[in-house]
Every structure is written in C-alpha cells, then in structure tokens.
C-alpha cells in the first residue's frame, strides 16, 4: 500500500550524513592542509554525530517505515548502523599514517568516498524494498571501486579495482535479474508485500525459484562466499592496506543486512528453497577458504581466504534459522549470525590494524615473514596478534570461540548435526595457519633490522582497546549475544 505521508525524521542519519559528506567535500576543496587534517577531523566528527543521533533514536524507540515502504527503521538497523559508524571511524584512525606516507591524501577523496560508501551501506541496512536494496548497493560499490584505485600510479591497485568492478557488475546483474523475476512473480517491489503474496500462495512459483537462485548468487558474491569468491583474495592483496581495511569492515555488515532483509523479510515463505543453497555455499566456503589459506605466504591474502571461511560460518547460521514452528530457535540462529558478523568485523579491524602499524614509508608489511620476531620488537603488539589469531581460530576464552559455538549450537538445534561436524573439522584445519602466524611472531628470528613502529599514540591505544575487547567479549559474551537475539526478535516479525 502506498503511503501518502513521508516521515523524513526516520531517515535523519542518512540525510545528515549526505549533508555532512557534501560539507566535508566543499571544505576540503578550500583547505590549506596538505595532509587533509581538517577533512580527517571533520569526517570523525561526522561519525560521532551520527552515532549520537542513532543512539538517541534507538533509546527512544524510533521505528517505522517511510518513503512508501522503501526505508525501514528498527532496532536491527540501529545496531548495525552504530556498529558501522564505529568500524569506519576505527578504519580512518588506523589508516591515517599509512595514507599520509603513501601520498593518498593529495585530495580529500579518501575521506569523502568512505563517507559516501557508508551512506550506501546505511541505505542497504534500512532497505525495505528491492529498489532501495539495489540503490544502496550501487552507491556503496561505486565508492569502493574508486577507493581501491585511489593511487592512480599503483598498477596492482588499479588491476584490483578493475577486477572488482567487472565482477561486481556481474554480481549486480545477477541481483537485478533475480529481483526482476521476483517482481514478475509477485507484482511487488516492497519486501513486506512480497512476503505477503508468497505466504498467500498467489505468486508464480517457477520464476520465483529461479529468481531466488540469482539473488543468492549475487548475495554470495557480496559476502565473498564460494564459488563467487574469486575477487576477494586479489582485491584484498592488491588494494592499499588502508582500503583493504575499509573493504573488510562495514561493507560486510551491510552485505549481511541485505541478505537478512531479502531472505528473511521478503522471501521467508520460500526458506526451504534458499536454505539448501546457503548450506552448500557454507560448506564450500569453509572447505575452500581454510584449505587454500594454508598455502598462502602473503598475510593479506591469507586473511582474505580466512574471510571466505568465516562467511561460511555466517551462512550456516542463516541456514539454521529455517526451523519450522520454532520461532525462538530461528531468532537464536539469526542472532548468532549477527553476533558472529559483528565480532568478526571487530577482529578483522585489529588484524589489518596490525599490518598498518608495521608498515612504514617504503615498506609494506604484507608477507607472513614480515611478522618474524615481532615479540622482540614489541611484546605488547605481539600479544595482540596472538589474541587475534587465537580468536579467528576459535580458541577459548576469546570471542571467536563463543561466536563459533553459538553458530554450532544453532546448527545442531536445527537438526543438521553432520553440518556441525563438518564445520568443526574445517575449523581445526583452519587453526593451522593462524597458529603458524603466532609461531612466526614468537619463535622466528627477524629477517631485517628492527625499525620503529610508524603509528601514533592514538592508533596504538585504539589497537590495544580493540584487542582487549576481543578478550572481554570472549569472557563476557552474554550481553552482546542477548542484544543480537533481541534485535532479531523485534525487527523481523515474520519469524
């Protein structure tokens, strides 16, 4: 049903971000700071303002739909947006020194494009229609393409941008084709209306199933799941590390939100069809991601394949949410996936933060061997690396262990014990390459002369907080986990 009243207040964060991003762009054009300090500070201030606004909306129970149902505000969107603001702010702080030393601040494009990419992510998170899903996705993707190619004289980065652009266009084509078939079958673009039509049995079933296949393929690409993962290692390795950090953070949250909105909000009535697809993608991602990561010598490439395997766990959680007649089990499964995604992004930020910390003018810390002897140079940062690798491997008492345990509990609750066993086996295989990094850090001799760590006190302090959170959330995961489950319950009424 079309709404005659448009409530702009619901979309205050997006409107505010658009205005502030344009203001940052204009101020940058007349700024005299060669290192773009003004633009940097204004970007962080923008993120702080957005965090306050979203917290205010959430605490006051602001929710609803506007723009004819194309935009949704609920507790799910509030949580993911606030997490995205924090992730982007951490990204900008970590990458500041790196961007300066790589001449990436000749203009203020790095900060403005990051804010515009965030705007696209926010639209994806609050999407209530196939149209808004696609508009948000394209806004985010176009900004990310430009960010990867920001160093115009870097041939490797330009190649990575071209690969991402071509394959991203293909994935967008899959999504568009799938959306067109869903629209043709149901006669609606609004996700709530699509769900209603499917539930009433009025939709044309055959084209709808084909539409789901194309939608899942497009979603798998954006998440980086096998067999649509081919862009992940090349783009992660080829991009400047500061941009790789941007790619591995908030965009993953937006892709997860898009997946949940489309499959749970819009296509929940056909869960039996997409559940089997997600399970296949999950097992393939766990297998290919972990087995391929073992042979990598490039640290960024290893983390890329690690990302693929972790997306397998997220997809397992989403597939496990399809439990007929058990709304509590479904909420727990989707909540576990949300918890996993948030904590994974937290760990990824710190992992690439370490790479940025160890990189300096004329030296890229990209090889695993570049971490040799880190314990001798900086025992504290070596300890952070140990915490990160143990968490990614799923070793207690770190948050990665609890995140995987929650997913496995959801998988077993849904009756797929064999899948849980497979996931555990591949996690054990994956532990090898994480422990190899720890071995290099603590037991190998450094291959080069010690050099001072090129990072400010703010960056080192933030990295320490980042590492501490991984331990604290592992020891006390209950609060965040309960919040994730509650957010799912209140935001997805169809469960």
UniProtKB/Swiss-Prot annotation:
It is found in: Cell inner membrane. The chain crosses the membrane at residues 6-26, 38-58, 75-95, 107-127, 130-150, 164-184, 208-228, 240-260, 277-297, 304-324, 338-358, 382-402, 415-435, 468-488. It comes from the Bacteria. Pfam families: Proton_antipo_M (PF00361). Its EC number is 7.1.1.-. Keywords: Cell inner membrane, Cell membrane, Membrane, NAD, Quinone, Translocase, Transmembrane, Transmembrane helix, Transport, Ubiquinone. It is a multi-pass membrane protein. GO terms for biological process: ATP synthesis coupled electron transport. Disulfide bonds: none annotated. Its main location: membrane. It catalyses: a quinone + NADH + 5 H(+)(in) = a quinol + NAD(+) + 4 H(+)(out). NDH-1 shuttles electrons from NADH, via FMN and iron-sulfur (Fe-S) centers, to quinones in the respiratory chain. The immediate electron acceptor for the enzyme in this species is believed to be ubiquinone. Couples the redox reaction to proton translocation (for every two electrons transferred, four hydrogen ions are translocated across the cytoplasmic membrane), and thus conserves the redox energy in a proton gradient. NDH-1 is composed of 14 different subunits. Subunits NuoA, H, J, K, L, M, N constitute the membrane sector of the complex. Belongs to the complex I subunit 2 family. This is NADH-quinone oxidoreductase subunit N. The gene is nuoN.
